[in-house]
Design a protein with these regions (language model features):
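A short, structured beta-strand/loop element
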Residues: 4-44
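Long, charge-rich, low-complexity alpha-helical segments
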Residues: 28-74
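Intrinsically disordered, low-complexity and often Lys/Arg-enriched segments
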Residues: 1-6, 73-74
Length: 74
């Protein structure tokens, strides 16, 4: 399994949506993915609504978030 770093998937740029974390190459906030999942919507619906985000990027971003959280709890 290839390791993905945050900058490969999620970026922050003050010129893009005021610097909130977005998927690289898009204006789609990472928070939008979390909101969809929190609301009980499937990943497939998020990807359908935001076609500029690939399945691979969404899964990689979730893996990064999981790793970060688990790392903080250790």
């Amino acid at each position: 399994m290839q390791t993905v770093s945050e900058g490969q998937v999620i970026v922050r740029d003050p010129e893009v949506l005021g610097g909130i974390p977005v998927f690289r190459g898009t204006r789609v906030p990472f928070q939008a993915l979390l909101d969809y999942l929190e609301g009980g919507q499937p990943l497939s619906e998020f990807l359908e609504d935001f076609p500029t985000v690939s399945h691979e990027a969404a899964v990689a971003a979730l893996e990064l978030a999981k790793s970060s959280l688990v790392g903080q709890l250790r």
